Each structure stands twice: as structure tokens, then as C-alpha cells.
Amino acid sequence: MSLPRLLKVNIRTYDNSIPISESSRKSWNQKHFALTFPKPLQRGTNDKSRPLKSQITVTRHDKRKLEEGQKPAHKWIRHSFRKILQWPPIYTAAREQTPFRHLYTSKTHLKKAEYKKSKDEKGGTPLKKDSKKKGGSYATNPESKQIVEEKTKRQNEADKTPLKSSHENEQSKKSKSSSETNPESQNSKTVSKNCSQKDKKDSKNSKKTNTEFLHTKNNPKKDLKRSKTSNDPISEICSENSLNVDFLMLVGQSDDESINFDAWLRNYSQNNSKNYSLKYTKYTKKDTKKNAKKSSDAESEDSKDAKKDSKKVKKNVKKDDKKKDVKKDTESTDAESGDSKDERKDTKKDKKKLKKDDKKKDTKKYPESTDTESGDAKDARNDSRNLKKASKNDDKKKDAKKITFSTDSESELESKESQKDEKKDKKDSKTDNKKSVKNDEESTDADSEPKGDSKKGKKDEKKGKKDSKKDDKKKDAKKNAESTEMESDLELKKDKKHSKEKKGSKKDIKKDARKDTESTDAEFDESSKTGFKTSTKIKGSDTESEESLYKPGAKKKIDESDGTSANSKMEGLESKRGFRMSSKKTTFNEKGEKASTGRVPPSREKPPLPACEPSLPSPKVRRLCWCKMPPPPPKPRYAPLPEAPWIHKLL
């Protein structure tokens, strides 16, 4: 272990006793107070084995004490030192004398720290007095007295430095207040920087003087290095006089706390001055940015407001124009309409139709009414459908005749037939739209309104084109229907002719098939020599293979072979007319037939056997019908279940 660890241990003259743990104490008490009675006699044991006198037992602890008392002094001292070094740090902490500590900590209790500071300014802290009193009691050597005097001087210097720092802190606060009132912030920055540099220099000088006695608790490694490198008289005193170790530790700790407190005050003042300067610069920058943003935002808002106002004015103008047009229309409709609601509806519908016919007159008289009429044209189409449905009612016919003086002929036609009216209305709308487009264009050029009317004219032209296309499609559909009927009649006639021809060809094929069966033997002999086959034979084999797939159980007869040859001829004729069959097919039966025909000629082949009759079951085995079968024996029943509802639910 290192030397500074030993400094914490209090080595005194009266520490001769070896410490005992609680477990060892309990065991020692049990052994010490246990009464030793003689063992009871047992049967079969010899009297010689029993001790004649009761043996007085001595505990191990007492034996160790006796041995240690007999040992020389230097041996048991070394032994005790070894034990102390081997102990864990808990025991050393327990054996340490509690050091002198202040009743407050500088970080948590700032009010107490300020109170102590005011006392230091007036004169001598109570800490110094206590340290002097204790120094007088312990300091017996002249070297220790010198050390105490040096420490008191250093403490006085350290007390002066925080006064300077506090004075500088006040100056920085004053500079901050002046900078807030005055716009010149550069002077305050330079003052704060100079003050911070001075504080740093003072703190460095004070650290150099107090490095010997700074024992920080958080950095024990640094303390070890300082204790090795420093050649202070503390190590000599510790080696010579072990009694003065406690005093030195107490004085050192009190000095550490006072110095640490002063250093903390310095750092606190420096940090405050820096923070104030930084915050002020940030606030000034933010203020400039905010002012710039506000000015830009105000300009943008003004421009936006101007745009919005212009848009609102335009919208209001448009709305006013629309309202005027609507009022004109409503006035005209109200004048023409009767008292009842039904008559008003009819008048509106009829007026919309009249407007289409009278667009020529209206455009010359009222050029502004073109906007409203375009909207009315759309409504007129929707209303025309309603009029067609409502034309069946007799009441509406009478109302329409009263109101529409100019369109008497149209109303009479609508009352007669609704279908004819639809066609006529479409034609009239086309012609009126075309005329209105031309008149609208002329009127818009005269009244300096070319844009709106030209668009309406284009829309009317498109609608007219669509209607004309629909009529053309209807005519084409009728023509196509007539042509399809004619074609279907021709196809039926042709099909009849083809069916007759096929019947005649079948008769010829049957005659040819008989001749072909006789000539097949010669053809197969030639195919065995050359190794090639004609298309008719391949097709015949294909048909046979397909039939064999459908009939796997039964074999073919001689009569069926004639039918297959006839079918092969039919397919050969069809191939000449139209399409050609594929010469290869991947069927298993086809390959087997090819292999057999290649080796053995068909003349030498055995005739196919007749179809076997289906094997009937033997008469001995009689299968009983399920309906006549006796019922199965009943299953063994278990014990009856208790009549509980939850059991039935589970089942």
C-alpha cells in the first residue's frame, strides 16, 4: 500500500488491542461460558477410556493472548501492521477520527457563505481561531509551528483575492446596466474581457501558492503524485512523530475547504461576467434580426393586403353584375308569370325556349345579357326534359297555350306526341344555336366583348357537332342492321348447300373406303421398305389412337377398322381444302402402333380378338343390400350423467 493511505490511520500508543469481529466474539463467548460436564457412561465401554479427572479446557483466544504476551514487542507490532494493511477500507474508515467540518457547504447554503464572507471582511474568521487553538494543543515541535504560520499567511492572501473578484463583479454589473441604457455595446464587451483576464491571472497566482495544501477529494491519483514529487516537511514529521498526524490532517482539511470555497467564489464571478456579456450580445443580435424581420414582414403584408383588396374589388364588381342580370331576368319572369306557382314554373320553362329563338334580337338590344343567356341555355336543356314528361298533363298544355303566343305550333305538337317533339326540339336547338353564334360574334365585336361571347359561340358549335354526330350514328346503325340481316340470310343459304354437298361426299367416301382397305396391304409393304408414310395413314392412326383413349377396356373389331379408314379419308379431303393437320402427336398408343407396323406387315398380323364380356361376380357370393342389413349392435352405454346443466353444455 502507498504512504498516503497510512496517513489517514491514527497510530497511537494505546492501540495495542487487536480488533475482533462480531462473529468471532459470539463464538468466543459461547466457548468461554460453556460448562464442561463429564460425559455419561455408556454400556460396553471400558473404564480405561474415560478420563479420571475433569480436564480444564482453555479457549483458543486465551491461548493466542498468552502467546502474544510472551512474544517480543517488535514481532507483535509487525504482525498488527500486517493485519491493518490487509483490512478492507471499511475498517480503516471506522477507525479514523472524525475530522473537523463546517456546519455548511458552500454550494447548497449560499446564504451562510455570504454571512461568513461579511465576517471575513470585518476581521478574522472563527475558523482561524479554532485552528490556532487546536494548533496550540497539538503543536509541540518548532517545525509544526512554522507550518501553521505559513498556512495562516496564505489564508489571509486567499481572503483578499475574493474581495477583488467581488469588486470586479460589481464593476461588470455596472457596465452591463450602462450598456443597456447606452446603445454602445462594444465598450462593455472590452471591459468584461479585461476583467475576466485579470481574474484568471489572480487565480493562477493563488493556485501556485496553495498547491502544497490542495488535497481534492475527487482526484486521489493527483494527490498520490503530489505526495511523491513534493519534498515538503510533512513527510519528515510523519516519519518522526506519529502523534502529530491527526493534527496535520485536520489543519489540511480546514484549509482545503476554505481555499476551495474561495476558488468557487472566483469561478462563479468569472462565469457570471462572461455569461452577462454573451447574453447581451445575443440579445442585441436578436433585436436587430427581429427589427429587420418586422420591416420585411410589414412590407410583405402591405403588398398582400393591396392584392387582396384588388381581388375583393374585382369579385364585388362581378357579383354586382351578376345580381343586376339576375334581377333583370326575375323582373321579366315576374311580369310575364301569373299568380299561381304552377303558371310561374311553366312560364320560366317556356321563356327559356323563347330566348333561344329570340337571341338575335336580344344581342342587338341587350349586349350585356349574353352572360345570363348562356347560363339559361344550360338550364333550358335540363328543363326541356322536364317539359317532355310534364307535357302529358292537360293542365300544363292549357297554361303553355296562354303564355306562349309566338310558339303556338310547338306547344300543340308537344301535346300530341312526345317522341316527335324530342327530335324537332333537337333540330331547332341546332339551327338556333348556329344562328345565335353568328349574331353573338357580330354583337360582341360591336360592343367590345369578344372574349366571353366567342367562348360561348365555340361551346354552341361543339354542342351542334355532337348532336349531328349522334344522328349520323343512328343512321349508320340502321344501315348496319339491314346489311347484317342480308348477310345472315346468305350465310344460311350457303350452309344448306354445304350440308348437301357433305352428304354426297360421305356416300362417295364410303365407296372409296372399301377400295382403300384392299390396297392398304400393298401400301404397308412399301412403307416397311422406305420407312416413310403418307399423310392419310398417319391421320387414320391418330383417329384410332383418340378412339382407343376413350375406350380403354374393349378392343376394336374388323368392322370398326372400316369406319376409321373412312374417317381418315374425310380428314384427308378437309386438309386439301383448308388447313393441314400436324404430322406428329405425342400419344403413347401411336408410338406402339408405329413400332409394330415397321417390323410386321399388317397382312401377317393376327386379327384383333373380340371384345371380352364383363366378368360377372360368382353366384356364390351374395351381397346384401344396405337397406336389408340388420342394424349394428348398440354401443355399450356408460353410467348416466348427473342432471347438471353445465355438463350438457360441455357435451
UniProtKB/Swiss-Prot annotation:
Compositional bias segments (type: Basic residues): 495-505
Biased composition (Basic and acidic residues): 111-129, 146-173, 196-205, 284-308, 318-331, 338-368, 375-402, 413-441, 448-482, 506-518, 587-607
Gene Ontology CC: acrosomal matrix; cytoskeletal calyx; nucleus; sperm head
Sequence ranges of the Sequence repeats: 278-305, 306-342, 343-379, 380-417, 418-453, 454-491, 492-531, 532-553
Comp. bias intervals (Polar residues): 186-195, 230-241, 529-538
Stored Pfam families: Cylicin_N (PF15241)
Outcome after substituting K459N: In SPGFX8; uncertain significance
Amino acid composition bias (Low complexity), ranges on this chain: 271-281
Domain of life: Eukaryota
One function term, GO molecular function aspect: structural molecule activity
UniProt note on tissues of expression: Testis.
Keywords, ordered alphabetically: Cytoplasm, Cytoskeleton, Developmental protein, Differentiation, Repeat, Spermatogenesis
Region span, 8 X approximate tandem repeats: 532-553
Coiled coil: none
One BP term from GO: spermatogenesis
Region (Disordered) residue spans: 110-241, 267-615
InterPro entries: CYLC, Cylicin_N
Subcellular location: Cytoplasm, Cytoskeleton, Perinuclear theca, Calyx; Cytoplasm, Cytoskeleton, Perinuclear theca
Associated disorder: Spermatogenic failure, X-linked, 8: A male infertility disorder characterized by a significant reduction in progressive sperm motility, and aberrant sperm morphology. Patient sperm show head and midpiece defects with deformed and detached acrosomes, and flagellar defects.
Protein name: Cylicin-1
Organism in which the protein naturally occurs: Homo sapiens (Human)
Highest classification ranks of the organism: Eukaryota, Metazoa, Chordata, Craniata, Vertebrata
